[in-house]
Amino acid sequence: MEWVLQRSYFKTGTLGALFVNGKFRCFTIELPWRENRRNVSCIPEGRYEVKPRISNKFGNHLILVDVPQRSLILLHPANDALGELQGCIAPVSELSGIARGLHSRRALERLLVIHRDAVERQEAVYLTVTYNAHEYLRTLSKTHPAVFPHPAGGGD
């Protein structure tokens, strides 16, 4: 099963849209790109296997396998990337600002069901992380510049 995370980078965070087999499933929030430095940067673009994981802190969640120069990169609930993430990815149902979202647990639960169904069919799940300046982000940066500044690296 193929999941694709299409990201837009901003100075203070990274926003994404996650698609499963081509269908939009949720938004994501992450830390800004800071040269893949541990605990302060989102992960590099690439293709990663997604596996289930359980911990006392997050309960059921997902982990990305073999992220270069990183370990324990999780998909777990968080609504404020700068305050709650250390390089992981948080699925959210709605975006509320750069690196901020709403209803993260709900979004994660949907992904867990999709992942579990794939595992039951003995399908491996892969996440491809890529750059894509989405039209919705360009539009939001024009209509709400205080909340959604232009993506890092330029305007349109």
What does each model-identified segment do?
Residues M1-Y126, T130-G153:
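Cell wall/extracellular polymer interaction/catalysis modules
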